[in-house]
């Protein structure tokens, strides 16, 4: 009888361990590439060609992020919207948002084994300093950019609250008071035409001025801002973030530490300084580019990412920001880059579009950079209880009654030569590091436990490639 009881206990323990370990094994990794350009803006390939190229490399998920609008304007005061110079290149809005969405749908239907997700790269705002007459005209923050992901309604693009967006005939709410005032003035002038003497002349003047000012007010512009009144802080970007969120889309700050934003561009200067502080100043965005073609510092221990994540843990933010890899892919071989060097790997239960989007929204993914096809792989990053009955992966919350146990397993898709350094970070503090060669397995028991506290763990790997994980949150309970 005692032996039977022991057997039952062992079976229960075995079931609990298997159940907990299956939390991670229930998910399958699906590689994707974010931040692709097509011929709808400044990319070299049409969407169908991008799909064929990705399939040949085993990449199953593509995020098309063409520029929604590539335009700059400078107008002469006081009629800046009438006496102006405008430069515009190919973009979603210039080519047609409806055409863009329909083409993605057509290619998706023709390639059911691939997942193609629409989006855009956007520049909500920039501002001018200097003068065109003195040769020192400078556009500031024109390359301070946000990726939009998951919007599938053409009207959502046509009404984006960004500068110079006149691609919808719908008058924005912010412009209605001015439109009503000028319309009333025009009607008053029309009435004055029936009067005699100087009143009739005044009526003509009022009507002409009303029409001119109405045209100059640009009532179809979707942004309440203009580029002539200096820096407006985070307001234009927060407006865009909130607009996209209200329509079910996601937003990611792109290239927050850009090194190429200051240069001569034809007769003008463009000046976009690194903007990592945007991660702190804005709210409600989904994440940011934690890995791209430049060195960055925001992911360093106790850097800006950790500051924002700790704000979330303290209840000062509604959601944490997730990290993704952004490819900025325009052409195979351009600047030495090829499709597949920068990937975001999603953990999903089924390879479906809705599952990919949910994994992205929930942070169940990691960013990786290699030299395709030699790409490092994060086989496991998990936090569990000591007895393995509770276990979580990136993007998840776990509640623990004791010390956390962290497990990291790394390998590579093809043999990789060279050393790697793996760092484990707890709430901004570097708590453990290991150097070695791939494949590599790390198990670390963290002697940290404070009931009532919320913390997180994240890891990165550098050397023979780069991996940046998303955080796993831990709630300590008694």
Briefly describe each language-model feature range.
Residues 2, 23-29, 41, 47-51, ...:
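C-terminal functional module detector
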Residues 270-296, 345-355:
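Structural recognition of alpha->loop->beta junctions
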């Amino acid at each position: 009888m005692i032996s039977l009881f022991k057997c039952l206990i062992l079976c229960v323990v075995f079931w609990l361990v298997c159940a907990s370990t299956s939390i991670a094994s229930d998910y399958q990794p699906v590689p994707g590439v974010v931040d692709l350009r097509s011929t709808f803006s400044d990319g070299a390939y049409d969407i169908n060609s991008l799909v064929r190229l990705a399939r040949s490399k085993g990449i199953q998920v593509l995020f098309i992020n063409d520029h929604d609008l590539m335009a700059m304007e400078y107008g002469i005061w006081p009629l800046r919207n009438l006496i102006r110079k405008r430069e515009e290149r190919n973009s979603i809005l210039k080519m047609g948002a409806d055409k863009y969405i329909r083409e993605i749908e057509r290619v998706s239907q023709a390639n059911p084994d691939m997942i193609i997700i629409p989006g855009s790269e956007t520049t909500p705002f920039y501002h001018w300093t200097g003068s065109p007459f003195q040769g020192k005209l400078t556009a500031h923050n024109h390359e301070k950019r946000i990726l939009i992901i998951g919007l599938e309604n053409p009207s959502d693009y046509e009404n984006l609250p960004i500068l110079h967006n006149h691609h919808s005939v719908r008058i924005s709410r912010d412009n209605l008071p001015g439109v009503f005032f000028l319309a009333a003035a025009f009607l008053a002038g029309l009435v004055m035409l029936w009067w005699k003497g100087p009143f009739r002349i005044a009526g003509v003047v009022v009507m002409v001025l009303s029409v001119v000012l109405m045209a100059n007010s640009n009532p179809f512009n979707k942004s309440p801002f203009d580029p002539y009144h200096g820096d407006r802080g985070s307001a234009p970007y927060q407006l865009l973030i909130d607009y996209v969120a209200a329509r079910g889309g996601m937003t990611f700050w792109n290239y927050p530490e850009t090194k190429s934003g200051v240069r001569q561009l034809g007769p003008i200067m463009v000046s976009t300084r690194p903007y990592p502080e945007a991660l702190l100043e804005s709210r409600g965005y989904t994440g940011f580019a934690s890995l791209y073609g430049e060195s960055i510092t925001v992911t360093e221990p106790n850097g800006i990412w950790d500051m924002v994540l700790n704000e979330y843990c303290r209840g000062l933010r509604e959601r944490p920001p997730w990290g993704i890899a952004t490819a900025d892919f325009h052409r195979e071989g351009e600047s030495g880059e090829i499709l597949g060097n920068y990937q975001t790997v999603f953990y999903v239960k089924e390879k479906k579009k809705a599952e990919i989007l949910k994994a992205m929204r929930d942070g169940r993914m990691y960013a990786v950079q290699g030299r395709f096809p030699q790409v490092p792989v994060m086989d496991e990053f998990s936090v569990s209880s000591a007895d393995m009955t509770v276990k979580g992966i990136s993007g998840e919350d776990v509640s623990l009654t004791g010390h956390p146990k962290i497990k990291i397993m790394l390998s590579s898709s093809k043999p990789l030569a060279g050393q790697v350094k793996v760092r484990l970070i707890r709430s901004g503090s570097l708590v453990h590091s290991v150097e070695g060669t791939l494949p590599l397995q790390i198990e670390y028991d963290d002697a940290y436990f404070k009931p009532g506290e919320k913390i997180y763990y994240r890891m990165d790997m550098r050397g023979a490639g780069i991996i940046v994980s998303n955080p796993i949150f831990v709630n300590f309970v008694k």
